[in-house]
């Protein structure tokens, strides 16, 4: 049985969206048990009672505006810290939260701990592409500043995840840069390029540009945390703007626009599904001793369900154990 701890109080729509996502996952997957950390009365309001879900009542909650490291140190009885501690103590095998990203990163690093040999765990998510396949990108903001050796390690981590969790036999690894030529970029990216090109364990395809990200040019995209976070938010904003603009144009376009939308209904739904982050799961803080996964702050029950499904796959494939072995062998 796979044991997953969940922060029921994190996110914009907690605990309702969190608990409803858990209800669906418990219904669909008979091999998982969930520990919900948070306000028991609020959780019980939405929970479908089952022996495979337990509630650990907590009085404290880390808020979105709390200073991350300070909150983790001071709010030791919060749903987030206790959930992370459950993983450290072996009570749970993985932890999910839609709460304060910085605090979750701090809890992951200071409570759960990083794998020996991993310098900087990276925040990694599967991003949408127009063909629906997606690509893994890291770092998405766990580290604001990175060295070339960090990017080199991200490439190894990302390739390992794409192969062992997403089932891509030979993942194509690209370095996000301001041009595709080998000589492009600042000193950081030039040095990183040399390290990646010389790394025998990955299939490095060279530099890639941001404009090509959604065209499935790579399976893994490596970047520094500052740039990665900016790209993530740009992609989210662009997707929302495109869908909003289409909807507005159809509504205001009269009968012809509505008829055209009706004829294109299946294609429009496919586009919406391909651009939907909620079906891909959460962002993994990869490089820690256990799966620690961040749901989007505005996650609905579908996104929570997808994240539980993602974590279940990570536990099933034992990707973290394999990663520990890989770094031990180096």
From Swiss-Prot:
GO molecular function per UniProt: phosphate:acyl-[acyl carrier protein] acyltransferase activity
Keyword Transferase: yes
Entry superkingdom: Bacteria
Pathway: Lipid metabolism; phospholipid metabolism
Catalytically driven reaction(s): a fatty acyl-[ACP] + phosphate = an acyl phosphate + holo-[ACP]
Keyword Transferase: yes
E.C. number(s) listed in UniProt: 2.3.1.274
Subcellular location: Cytoplasm
Xref: HAMAP family: PlsX
Name assigned to this protein: Phosphate acyltransferase
Name of the gene: plsX
């Amino acid at each position: 049985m796979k044991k997953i701890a969940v922060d029921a109080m994190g996110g914009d729509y907690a605990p309702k969206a969190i608990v409803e996502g858990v209800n669906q996952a418990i219904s669909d997957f008979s091999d998982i048990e969930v520990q919900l950390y948070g306000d028991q009365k609020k959780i019980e309001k939405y929970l479908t009672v089952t022996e495979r879900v337990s509630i650990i009542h907590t009085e404290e909650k880390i808020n979105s505006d709390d200073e991350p490291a300070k909150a983790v140190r001071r709010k030791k009885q919060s749903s987030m810290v206790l959930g992370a501690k459950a993983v450290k103590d072996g009570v749970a095998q993985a932890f999910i939260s839609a709460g304060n990203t910085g605090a979750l990163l701090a809890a992951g690093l200071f409570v759960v701990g990083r794998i020996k040999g991993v310098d900087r765990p990276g925040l990694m998510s599967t991003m949408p592409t127009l063909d629906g396949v997606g690509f893994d990108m890291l770092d998405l903001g766990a580290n604001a500043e990175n060295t070339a050796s960090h990017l080199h390690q991200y490439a190894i981590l990302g390739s390992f995840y794409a192969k062992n969790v997403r089932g891509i036999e030979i993942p194509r690894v690209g370095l996000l840069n301001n041009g595709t030529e080998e000589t492009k970029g600042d000193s950081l990216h030039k040095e990183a390029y040399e390290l990646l090109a010389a790394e025998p364990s990955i299939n490095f395809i060279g530099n890639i540009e941001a404009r090509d990200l959604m065209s499935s040019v790579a399976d893994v995209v490596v970047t520094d945390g500052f740039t990665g976070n900016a790209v993530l938010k740009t992609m989210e904003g662009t997707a929302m703007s495109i869908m909003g603009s289409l909807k507005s144009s159809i509504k205001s376009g009269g009968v012809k626009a509505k008829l055209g939308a009706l004829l294109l209904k299946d294609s429009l739904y496919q586009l919406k599904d391909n651009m939907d982050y909620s079906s891909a799961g959460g962002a993994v803080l990869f490089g820690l001793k256990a799966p620690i996964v961040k749901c989007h702050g505005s996650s609905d029950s579908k996104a929570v369900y997808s994240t539980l499904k993602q974590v279940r796959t990570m536990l099933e494939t034992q990707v973290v154990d394999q990663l520990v072995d890989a770094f031990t062998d180096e």
